[in-house]
Each structure stands twice: as structure tokens, then as C-alpha cells.
């Protein structure tokens, strides 16, 4: 992929981080190798500029949860749509979260830092019963 479009440049930056490209047809295989993982789904940065911020935010977010052996997969524009369809995701950027090979949920869009941490905590930490 050349750097002809904003997404091409973003794609190259994500590859430079060592993140794994994944397709909808290979996602299940990837999850067997990376049971604690996130999959970054994107859209055209010209249409949705916050897509360019998502890799930075997610990279930092994963450091806040060191009890997991996080792996990161990335999907190109076409595969983002296919994977998004599979998981009912229609708002991008989106990050699918898996722990122990199980789908835990999705982080859609960009959020303030404290809110993002709380959203992720709700996905990955065991639910504790609360007294009513």
C-alpha cells in the first residue's frame, strides 16, 4: 500500500507498530493465537477524522490493563466493513475487545480518557455484584 491516501498513511503507521493485518475470514484463526486481543476497525479518515486518533488512544489504553497479554489486529477499509457487519458495528472507528478468546464488546468512536478507561474496564474486568 502506498501513501496515496490518508488511510494508506494511517495503515503504514499501524503496521510500523507491529500490529497484525486481519481479514474477516482469518479473524477466528487470529483469535486462537491472540486470545487477549483488540481489532481496530477503521473508515476513511477524510470522512471520519477521529479514525487517525484511534490507534494512539488504543495503544495507550492497553497499557492501563497489564494483566492481559494484548495483541492488536488491524483491518483495512474493506475488511473493517466486513468484520463490523459480523459484530453489528456501524460506527467507526471501532475497537473490538476479546479476552480469553471471547468477544467482550466494542468501543465505538473517541472518548475522553477517563471515560475510555471506564468503558474498557466494564468490558474486561469481571462483573462484581453490587448491593442494591
From Swiss-Prot:
It holds the Pfam family HyaE. InterPro entries: NiFe-hyd_mat_HyaE (IPR010893), Thioredoxin-like_sf (IPR036249). It comes from the Bacteria. GO terms for molecular function: signal sequence binding. SUPFAM superfamilies: Thioredoxin-like. Not known. Could form, along with HyaD, a complex involved in the processing of the hydrogenase 1 structural operon. Belongs to the HupG/HyaE family. This is Hydrogenase-1 operon protein HyaE. It comes from Escherichia coli (strain K12).
Amino acid at each position: 500500500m502506498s501513501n496515496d491516501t490518508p488511510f494508506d498513511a494511517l495503515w503504514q503507521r499501524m503496521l510500523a507498530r507491529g500490529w497484525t493485518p486481519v481479514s474477516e475470514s482469518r479473524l477466528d484463526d487470529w483469535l486462537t493465537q491472540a486470545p487477549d486481543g483488540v481489532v481496530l476497525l477503521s473508515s476513511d479518515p477524510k470522512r471520519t477524522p477521529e479514525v487517525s486518533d484511534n490507534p494512539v488512544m488504543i495503544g495507550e489504553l492497553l497499557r492501563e490493563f497489564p494483566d492481559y497479554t494484548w495483541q492488536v489486529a488491524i483491518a483495512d477499509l474493506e475488511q473493517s466493513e466486513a468484520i463490523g457487519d459480523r459484530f453489528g458495528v456501524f460506527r467507526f472507528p471501532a475497537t473490538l475487545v476479546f479476552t480469553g478468546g471471547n468477544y467482550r464488546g466494542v468501543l465505538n468512536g473517541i472518548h475522553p480518557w477517563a471515560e475510555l478507561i471506564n468503558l474498557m474496564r466494564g468490558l474486561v474486568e469481571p462483573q462484581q455484584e453490587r448491593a442494591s
